[in-house]
Amino acid sequence: MSGKERTEENGAVKQDTKEQVKKSADNGDKGVDEVDFAKIGLEDAFKYLNCSEHGLSGAEAEARLKQHGPNKLPDNSRNPVLVYFGYMWNPLAWAMEAAAIIAIALVDGADFALIVGLLIINATISFVEESNADKAIKALSAALAPKAMALRNGAMVTIDAVDLVPGDVILIRIGNVVPADVKLLPEHGADDYETPVQIDQAALTGESLPAKKFTGNVAFSGSTVKQGERHAVVYATGVNTFFGRAAALISGTHNVANIQRVMNRIGGLCLITIGVWVVIEVPVQFAHYKHSCVAGKEGCPTLLNMLVILVGAIPIAMPTVLSVTLALGAYKLAREGAIVTRMSAVEEMAGLDVLCSDKTGTLTLNKLSIDPSNVFPVGTMDIPEVMKFGALSANIITEEPIDMVLWESYPEREKLKSEYKHTKYFPFNPNDKITIATVLEIATGRVFRVLKGSPQVVLAKAWNAQALDGPVNEKIKEYAGRGFRSLGIAMAEGDGKDGTKWEMLAVLPMFDPPRHDTKETIERCMKQGIAVKMVTGDHLLIGKETAKMLGMGTEMYPSEVLIKARNGDVEAPHGYKNYVAMVEACNGFAQVFPEHKFEIVEILQEAHHRVGMTGDGVNDAPALKKAHVGVAVADATDAARGAADIVLTEPGLSTIVTAVIGARKIFKRMTTYAKYTISVTFRIAFTFGLLTVIYDWYFPTILIVILAVFNDGAMIALSKDRVVASVLPSTWNLATIFVPGFVYAMWLTLSSWALYQVATHSTFFERMTPLPSLNTQHATLISWCEDEISSKLGVNPQDSLCTYPSYADQLNECKGSVSLSSQVPGVPTILDQCVTEQRYIRDALTRALIYTHLSVSGQAVVFVVRTSGFSLKEVAGVSTYVAFALAQFGATMFGIFGLGGYNKPRQNFDNCQFCDYSTHNRVLFFNSEVEPRAGTESVYTASVIGCGGYVIVAWIWAALFYTALDPLKWGLMWIMNDDGFRDRHAWRKSNHEAMERRSREQLDNKEFAGPSGMVPANFSNPLGRASMSKPVSALLDRKSASLVAINRSSMTVSHDPNHALNIGRRSMIGRPSGPLGRNSNTGQSNPLNSSSVEIKPDAPNKV
């Protein structure tokens, strides 16, 4: 569309809208919202906005900001109260809430209060920790807030997009997300033609192709500039934009993160386990043990006992610990320069095994330099003149790297500002790969154009392209072989209207040096199981040369090979089975367009790789979205940042690797807790399920709640634990969580059952220690009570309890005319009462013992599951040790002092004479001194009395069984090959055997079928270097040879054999040769050893 046609079109609609314009103007600011700016002309738009093409003043902008508000949508933040209670609304919390309902229904106020308290504590910790982490991440993310270039006070300045107001004149260019609804202004210097700005509106309108926008057209907030740049006037901001009005009608999708699925599965398995044990326990207790269930307080101890499994087998803290670990980890990543825009991306980053990286700015410094002496002129101009035209081609306003290096490379650049002026500028875009500047020479009025860009594209536009093809392409290859990027420069007289042909001026070499840490970072990636593939738009030879410098491997292909292979060309995969195998095996691709990045990601994902892709441009957005982890590098465009999962604030590959390792540490902490919580919850369910079914043994719910508060609360410390990142990509494998967790749970269940069995069914502890007996076997109790009654009371154990004075006054059966005979109907004997009391007190002591052992042995599992090595050797974080110490100190104190009986029996006496015989001191019960009455054992609830010195037994017992957990872990890791455990050991073994075999072959004088100049490898010479097969002194005594000492930058030659001999011998003093020529004590490389020596009879001074 020509400028004239557009003017006529605007004129046609102008008359139709004149009344609307007038009406809106009369209504003041309200009219701005009502006017259809797409249909009115620029003059009317400026009138309504009360502004001009020169923008606004600072004071006016500030006043409008107060009037119209910030340029952002209202915060979609949820009510904090609803967020808080949301932590109590999930399947795990529902189970706890069901337990609370059962407790209150059974008039068990203490358990009800404790369960509700546990829910509140859990929700509070979740709310506070996640809120703090979220605020911290938002604060760090503020630096990534969208910016805009606005004309304020007559100068173009960069401001936060949120501060834009109607009437601002802004500059939008390629890669920008349009920050507000705008109307395009005329292109600078355009007359009868103009270059359209291409804007992607797919997110707003669904259009698949970018829309071409001309002067007077509107562009909506949220759309992306795909090509071109233009000044525009803002007419709507915030909620008044097209996007803002539509936002209320858009319902966002709820994506369930992988971590949520994992939590659901773990929670589901725990609920199934609970259900199984409830189905088993209830019939056994009611049918086999003949328990009753009546109304009233403590009237149904069977159901109260169900609460032990219901509360203990629910990992109530799991959502808290895992979400807090993820949030705090994301905050730490943000501080290290990697801001997470999608929380679940942390998990996916941990599983990354292929990273496709840009070359420029990521692997290299993106600090270009031009050496004028290496410039290759192809016309009549000399080099200074070529550099002048290069400077004139640059648009220094946008500060693009190539523009800036061209400008800075011309010494007299400041003079150009007063002698020349840009009248029009065609910006770079990934498709055309050129820029065109129309330049006016102020003194003469001469107009000419300067073109720069890809040398092949520039060459194709030259009028004599055929003649220049050979020398230009040869020079491009020469530059590429030296690691230089090439830039073509051309010029043409006139403004292009007369069809003047282009004349190519020169090819300029630009060098972008690798970052100092890139090579080391790539080596770290390889050690971490991440394959780094270079994806660059530069020439293939440049890519290979850079890859060679970085030690990446040089198996690279141009992108056209990939396209041919995918389109069915059987020869294109270069000998590989198919294009997928080629992409997997190669080290990268060159001459890549943005759409090729998408193809590369898609192919790698077809091969089941977890793919990361870096990008910075607007056309990189599809590939960034497609990748499992899209990484927007530092200084990326708004569009790239919007599409990325991770936004880097620091340049370079090292930040990405640091983020990957950090993500793996976060993942390690989450899997550590997952294994821990599986083992602990299963252990509680199986331990108390078995004890109840086999022995009809009860345990108070209060201790399980306290256990959850102490141990699960302490596990928050895992979110900050010191862990070693996995050397392999980490993904959720529930088998490696459930199976070890179940095995550890069974082992711990065995330990608890064994402790209970030894304590209550044997005399081991009373024989081996001065501690009181906990044996509750009926025969043992009868024998013990008979001896105690006879020796201490001097009465017949078979006499009625009425004959014992302290009980006679309490029993109605003993009062009145009843004779204190040896036998009273309905009154138990002294022996019966003693047995009942002893069973009661010993069970109460045993519960304190079992509780202490449960707590210590259960939480100690975390030290086993947090590392694949020896748990006592691998040091955990200080917070983990402190949390363990505090939790177990509390548990030990409960074990020592108990709860004063906790619950008194339903039928009782005021004293417990025979309890004292067992504990050696007075038993202090809850509220009052009470005891059970013989014959009512099945209707009293479980009490807890401090077991004193038995806590030492609990610790020792836990320690003994702990010693087997590491071997169990290693066996499981071997069987399941967890974290590549079996592969690593198999590799070490095969490598060891291979080296031994080669050593034996050498000793047996077998012929070595290896490369020329090599010998069989052995332990002293692992690389099989021939020079190491002879003594160093024999090598140095060859006087006819010149010794060449090699370093990284050059090879210095000594022609004096004696000098070389002394240097060599000096360097070897005190340096025993270890593998790879390293000092076996220090691990440092020798400056001169047999692996860095080459003999050359006639060597020049420098090579």
From Swiss-Prot:
<feature type="region of interest" description="Disordered">
    <location>
        <begin position="1054"/>
        <end position="1103"/>
    </location>
</feature>
<keyword id="KW-0813">Transport</keyword>
<dbReference type="InterPro" id="IPR044492">
    <property type="entry name" value="P_typ_ATPase_HD_dom"/>
</dbReference>
<feature type="transmembrane region" description="Helical">
    <location>
        <begin position="266"/>
        <end position="286"/>
    </location>
</feature>
<dbReference type="GO" id="GO:0120029">
    <property type="term" value="P:proton export across plasma membrane"/>
</dbReference>
<keyword id="KW-0460">Magnesium</keyword>
<feature type="transmembrane region" description="Helical">
    <location>
        <begin position="845"/>
        <end position="865"/>
    </location>
</feature>
<keyword id="KW-0406">Ion transport</keyword>
<keyword id="KW-0597">Phosphoprotein</keyword>
<dbReference type="InterPro" id="IPR023299">
    <property type="entry name" value="ATPase_P-typ_cyto_dom_N"/>
</dbReference>
<dbReference type="GO" id="GO:0008553">
    <property type="term" value="F:P-type proton-exporting transporter activity"/>
</dbReference>
<dbReference type="GO" id="GO:0016887">
    <property type="term" value="F:ATP hydrolysis activity"/>
</dbReference>
<dbReference type="InterPro" id="IPR008250">
    <property type="entry name" value="ATPase_P-typ_transduc_dom_A_sf"/>
</dbReference>
<feature type="transmembrane region" description="Helical">
    <location>
        <begin position="944"/>
        <end position="964"/>
    </location>
</feature>
<feature type="active site" description="4-aspartylphosphate intermediate">
    <location>
        <position position="358"/>
    </location>
</feature>
<protein>
    <recommendedName>
        <fullName>Plasma membrane ATPase</fullName>
        <ecNumber>7.1.2.1</ecNumber>
    </recommendedName>
</protein>
<feature type="transmembrane region" description="Helical">
    <location>
        <begin position="734"/>
        <end position="754"/>
    </location>
</feature>
<dbReference type="Pfam" id="PF00702">
    <property type="entry name" value="Hydrolase"/>
</dbReference>
<dbReference type="InterPro" id="IPR023298">
    <property type="entry name" value="ATPase_P-typ_TM_dom_sf"/>
</dbReference>
<keyword id="KW-0547">Nucleotide-binding</keyword>
<feature type="transmembrane region" description="Helical">
    <location>
        <begin position="881"/>
        <end position="901"/>
    </location>
</feature>
<dbReference type="InterPro" id="IPR001757">
    <property type="entry name" value="P_typ_ATPase"/>
</dbReference>
<dbReference type="InterPro" id="IPR004014">
    <property type="entry name" value="ATPase_P-typ_cation-transptr_N"/>
</dbReference>
<keyword id="KW-0812">Transmembrane</keyword>
<keyword id="KW-1003">Cell membrane</keyword>
<comment type="function">
    <text>The plasma membrane ATPase of plants and fungi is a hydrogen ion pump. The proton gradient it generates drives the active transport of nutrients by H(+)-symport. The resulting external acidification and/or internal alkinization may mediate growth responses.</text>
</comment>
<dbReference type="GO" id="GO:0005886">
    <property type="term" value="C:plasma membrane"/>
</dbReference>
<dbReference type="GO" id="GO:0046872">
    <property type="term" value="F:metal ion binding"/>
</dbReference>
<feature type="transmembrane region" description="Helical">
    <location>
        <begin position="232"/>
        <end position="252"/>
    </location>
</feature>
<dbReference type="Pfam" id="PF00690">
    <property type="entry name" value="Cation_ATPase_N"/>
</dbReference>
<feature type="region of interest" description="Disordered">
    <location>
        <begin position="1"/>
        <end position="32"/>
    </location>
</feature>
<keyword id="KW-0479">Metal-binding</keyword>
<keyword id="KW-0375">Hydrogen ion transport</keyword>
<keyword id="KW-1278">Translocase</keyword>
<feature type="binding site">
    <location>
        <position position="620"/>
    </location>
    <ligand>
        <name>Mg(2+)</name>
    </ligand>
</feature>
<feature type="transmembrane region" description="Helical">
    <location>
        <begin position="690"/>
        <end position="710"/>
    </location>
</feature>
<dbReference type="InterPro" id="IPR036412">
    <property type="entry name" value="HAD-like_sf"/>
</dbReference>
<comment type="similarity">
    <text>Belongs to the cation transport ATPase (P-type) (TC 3.A.3) family. Type IIIA subfamily.</text>
</comment>
<dbReference type="InterPro" id="IPR018303">
    <property type="entry name" value="ATPase_P-typ_P_site"/>
</dbReference>
<keyword id="KW-0472">Membrane</keyword>
<dbReference type="GO" id="GO:0005524">
    <property type="term" value="F:ATP binding"/>
</dbReference>
<feature type="transmembrane region" description="Helical">
    <location>
        <begin position="643"/>
        <end position="663"/>
    </location>
</feature>
